[in-house]
A protein has these predicted regions:
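Catalytic cores of secreted or luminal carbohydrate-active enzymes
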Residues: 239-242
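Aromatic- and carboxylate-enriched substrate-binding clefts and catalytic-loop regions
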Residues: 56-237
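Conserved structural scaffold segments of CAZyme catalytic domains across common CAZy folds
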Residues: 1-86
Length: 242
């Protein structure tokens, strides 16, 4: 392990906004990517003994993680509210947006340091979509920089390759056809095109041999194969029954 003190690394479960597109019901405000919605997610996480919430794509613009922040989201307020409830906050970022698709520059460390000082617990870094030398080198640099500032990482679009043994602040890898695919699963002749239950018991042997796998589980609605439908803002999982 290349991190001398790992006591700050706290794995945990996450309440995920993107799964149902922030589609809250029974609230007295307009749900969406805004501060009241994420406070509700923090409440949910606290009530259900989850450790984190994630603020997914949309909290910032595509060009800057420092300046182009959504005016509907007050990160400092959410961090303070989360601290009261014992809930940490993870922010989404695309790999290219954060790094430019390569080495870690001083500007990248400035972003990581800025949000670490704010009280953010880590980043979900998305859309690597490659595992060549550039991506692997970038991942190692990101892990070291994040560890320096006590930040966790969840890497999406990248399969595990063992780096978490050197940098255990990397908690997960998503390089898998996860449950989110049920949001847009094609329906053919009245049934889903793919057999999710069969895949679910096969995927661990394809992806988890050398590290963890972020399948993004958590569907609260489960349907039989004949009743399954892909509904983006009210998604469901597929069960084994016909």
């Amino acid at each position: 392990c290349r991190i001398a003190d790992t006591s700050w690394i706290k794995p945990g479960k996450v309440a995920w906004d993107w799964w149902n597109t922030c589609n809250l019901t029974g609230v007295d405000f307009k749900a969406g990517m805004n501060t009241p919605t994420y406070k509700k997610y923090i409440d949910f996480a606290a009530e259900n003994q989850l450790e984190y919430i994630i603020i997914d794509e949309g909290w910032s613009g595509k060009e800057s993680l420092m300046e182009d922040i959504s005016p509907e989201i007050n990160l400092e307020e959410l961090v303070a509210y989360g601290n009261q409830k014992g809930i940490g906050i993870i922010l989404w970022a695309s790999w290219r947006n954060l790094t430019g698709g390569g080495d870690i520059s001083p500007a990248v460390e400035q972003v990581i340091s800025h949000y670490a000082q704010m009280g953010i617990k880590g980043f979900k870094i998305d859309f690597f979509d490659r595992d060549d030398q550039i991506a692997i080198s970038s991942t190692e640099q990101l892990a070291a920089c994040a560890a320096k500032h006590h930040m966790l990482l969840d890497l999406h679009g990248l399969k595990p390759f063992g780096i978490q043994r050197a940098y255990p602040n990397i908690l997960n890898f998503e390089g898998v056809k996860g449950l989110e695919n049920s949001k847009w699963e094609p329906i053919v002749n009245g049934a889903p095109l793919h057999d999710f239950p069969r895949y679910d018991v096969t995927a661990p042997y394809l992806r988890q041999l050398v590290g963890p796998m972020d399948y993004t589980p958590g569907a609260m609605v489960n349907a039989t194969r004949s009743l399954f439908r892909s509904v983006n803002d009210h998604p469901m999982s597929q069960g084994t029954r016909v």
